[in-house]
Amino acid sequence: MPLHLRMLFPAFTLATGFALGFIQPTGLLLGSAFAALLLVCDRYLPNWLWLMLTLLGGIALAAHLLPGFNPWQLWKPRRLSVDAAPYALRLSWDKLLLGTTLLAWWLAQAPRPAISHRRAGLTCVVTLLSVPLMAIALGLVAWQPKWPEGLLLWLAVNLGVAVMAEELLFRGVLQPALIKRLGVWPGVLLTASLFGAAHLPFSALFALLATVAGLGYGLVFLYSGRLSLAIALHAAVNLLHVLLLSYPLRLT
């Protein structure tokens, strides 16, 4: 896909957020600079510098550290599980921008060969079983089956914003770079560890769980060569969480 068409992804996100009043001029400027860095400067900057700036900018957007972005509250806080705190669904425009910009970059990357579809399938099954069971064993959640009102909206936001941005950043950008420098297993393991560390604000145990989940997502991408499968697996784990377990986390 030509660059001018791929640029429409972040441009539409910024224009929509600005028109609706959720992105301020400062956010518009910073978001445009990030999109230009990611999509244009990769051919002019040394690879290490582009990678470092992309990761720093990506983390800043994902962690809501840049000014000029206000979330869109789609649900008022409500209790989805009797043992969990009230949950409010929000659309984070900075994280959405990260995902759409990384998607525009990813569409220009060469396809990756598959190593083993059988291993990829087995990893999906193991991840879908082990992550929820580990979450229960660690006391992070309990068995709380439910069908929340507004589930489809939750799924659209979770998949289209959180999951897509996280997988494109960690598995799409970071994991291949680390594998190239460190080798396959060190690269996959370090990426999973950094993915887990990004969840430390929730708790150390949740970060450990995220590391295990991240290992599954990374191996699925490695074995299948398809980032879309890692995104689908990540979304499936999150869907099992909201449908079957305490959400977001069990109160202690």
What are these regions (language model features)?
Residues 71-162, 251:
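Juxtamembrane helix-loop-helix connectors linking adjacent transmembrane helices
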Residues 28-35, 95-99, 153-157, 209-217:
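Hydrophobic core segments of transmembrane alpha-helices in multi-pass, intramembrane catalytic enzymes
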Residues 5-7, 45-49, 147-151, 183-186, ...:
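Membrane-helix interface segments
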Residues 1-15, 154-157, 163, 177-179:
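Alpha-helical transmembrane segments and their cytosolic membrane-interface
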Residues 164, 185-192, 196-198, 204-252:
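Functionally important transmembrane alpha-helices
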Residues 113-116, 168-190, 219-226:
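Membrane-interface helix/loop boundary segments of multi-pass membrane proteins
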Residues 1-110, 242, 246-252:
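N-terminal, membrane-interfacial amphipathic/helix-forming hydrophobic leader that caps
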Residues 47-58, 117-126, 177, 182, ...:
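Cytoplasmic-side transmembrane-helix entry/capping segments in multi-pass membrane proteins
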